[in-house]
Amino acid sequence: AYAKDPVYPLEKTVANLTLDILNTAGPARDVVLVGEGQSELEDDLARAAAAQGRSVTPETLPENGLFYRADHFSLARGGVPVLLIMQIAGGADLVDGGREAGDQWIRDYIGNCYHQTCDAWNADWDLRGAVQDMELFRVIIEDLGNSRRWPQWRAGSEFKAIRDQSAEVRREE
């Protein structure tokens, strides 16, 4: 809905960062990127993750089309460079238990709670992983906010042409 009636014009919107489904399983050695190869924001994510001692892991099943089904997609279609991270998109490498524990957390969540009545806050969650991910976004947002940089779509992205059409508007800034 926002992309159809934005408060600020999409051509002057720097970026969209989306964290879909909080990591409630504890701190992780990685962050899972959905839609690898789409925008320069991935470079920002890699730098911020490295500063935390983490790596970026691409989603394990891109054929599921999560990039095209998540909340940010209307902004991407409007040309705004987007970044989507989602630990349940595969491969969560948890500090306590590694990938095996991460895979089990994903199986349990998807199989038992995702979009069901138990898909609500739980006092047993370990939100340290969610805090890690939010800190990644804070660093990226602060960097973008303190610069005059406009992240771009990568060559080959189907959204690049839309953003390129409005490049002149951003040069005026």
Which role fits each region the language model picked out?
Residues 87-163:
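His/Asp/Glu-rich mid-to-C-terminal helical/loop segments that flank catalytic regions of hydrolases
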Residues 1-98, 103-110:
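Metal-dependent peptidase/peptidase-like ectodomains
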Residues 65-73, 155-170:
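Amphipathic alpha-helical surface "interface" segments used
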Residues 7, 49, 53, 118, ...:
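Generic secondary-structure transition motif, activating predominantly at the C-termini of alpha-helices
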